[in-house]
Amino acid sequence: MENKMFCYQCQETAGCSGCTKFGVCGKSPDLARMQDLLIYTTKGLSEVTTRLREEGKEVSKDVNHLITINLFTTITNANFDDEVFYQRVKETLATKEDLLAKLANKENLSEAALWNAVSNEEMDVKVNLLSKIKDAILGSGKEESNIDKILDEKSTKVGVLATKDEDIRSLRELIIYGLKGMSAYMKHANALGYDSEDINAFMQATLAKTLDDNLSIDELIALTLETGKVGVDGMALLDSANTGTYGHPEITKVNIGVRNNPGILVSGHDLKDLELLLKQ
């Protein structure tokens, strides 16, 4: 029977081999496919930003942060809102089309970099693509519905299993999961005003390389190791952000007894959110 979805990015995946009907985490097949599409479109955008950098053109912080948040949004249990993923895919496509217009060399770009969610019929009548996708993002009725149908169809073709060679597939996904972890460090560092163009550029160039069918297994292994190395740089950036903003942790005595006062249970490690909560 054909899989309704395929996801094996967490340690709790069904049968230790992959969720194919429904996510153990609670993720639906529709949501899993839309996450696949978000990763696919983010790879395409990253290929364009990498090419822009090669041409000596600047990539804005807004674009860097869009890519970071796209990756972060797909990590296990981060977000289960279908509509969020539709909107992020549309925003990513709109951003990519805007940047493609600034790109001098469009030779040999991948299908992911060029795909735009507009049908051939609409292209034939010279639809204003950027306007159309932005209209869809804003929710203009019929246009939004048509775009969503195209996204749904595309999402069934770009998942993990689209790479047929198991070894290549596994290495690509290992790299992508490393980049997702890196995006978490970057997202939290960005929230405190810290950033790194070098890490952003690496993440995007590496995403683009997962589209390259010419890379060998040895080259992908080397890229996996490099991803781990840059991941340590991401951890260092986050540590600098945390300690630079809040100081270094100190051994502190706290009351662990029970009182009648209301309390707030905090889970996670977004210190900026915790700071804002404590200030309320």
Predicted regions and their residues:
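Metallocofactor- and cofactor-centric catalytic cores in central/energy metabolism, strongly enriched
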Residues: E2-Q280
